[in-house]
């Protein structure tokens, strides 16, 4: 198994800070998301899957990052969104339907984000379905360790199901219905900064059909996720060149439009030094 890069360790610290702060504000005292994070952070099987997914994506297929940094960045994005929505009084689907807690939603979203691209160990086409197949037993094992009592069978089932929905739905190829899964979809689309395209661009290769994704992503300087002005969430995409609009219009917006959380956010994008364009 590869050693962790400085970037991966930096993202891990951000996740630690985010999940700790989110759960510190809860009166229930439920620390399941924090216990989950320390389990997943040190899970060698998950680390191996994430590392090999990147080997296949970058080395074999010539695509951008689909490995540990990407999956953990998606987790960061999702936690930021959950925190902002929760602070704004927006309930998750589990909360609204009175079948789960906020901690359950956070747990499911973390599981989904950290495993959503595990199917890239097999290939690009249909990888969201392969991710579901690969992730199911891992999720079941982890939840059984953290919630071992028989009285938790329903809770484990609900968390696992929401996580699976987020994993299988992250490409917008399959309908999803929960806010939690919708957050995964958008969080995945928000990982589009130039760092994600850096390694593939440094590898000599002949021009291919998917190059626009690498070059457009390389123009994205920053993605901001913050509290919105007239909606709870605001996403701002800052870029150095107009080619970055491809990422916004062809990758992120279709994911937002397929998300049950689409009415909860504003989307802005623009070239640095110019006026921002509001899309949503």
Could you tell me what each predicted segment is?
Residues 67, 100-105, 152-155:
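General structural signal for secondary-structure boundaries
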Residues 45-51, 63-68, 72:
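An N-terminal, globular interaction/scaffold subdomain
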Residues 44-55, 104-112:
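Active-site-adjacent bridging/hinge elements
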Residues 1-41, 60-65, 76-103, 115, ...:
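Divalent metal-dependent phosphate-bond-processing catalytic cores, especially two-metal-ion Mg2+/Mn2+ enzymes
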Residues 27-52, 150-170:
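Short N-terminal signal/transit or membrane-insertion segments
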Residues 71, 75-82, 109, 128-173, ...:
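Histidine- and acidic-residue-rich, metal-dependent catalytic cores
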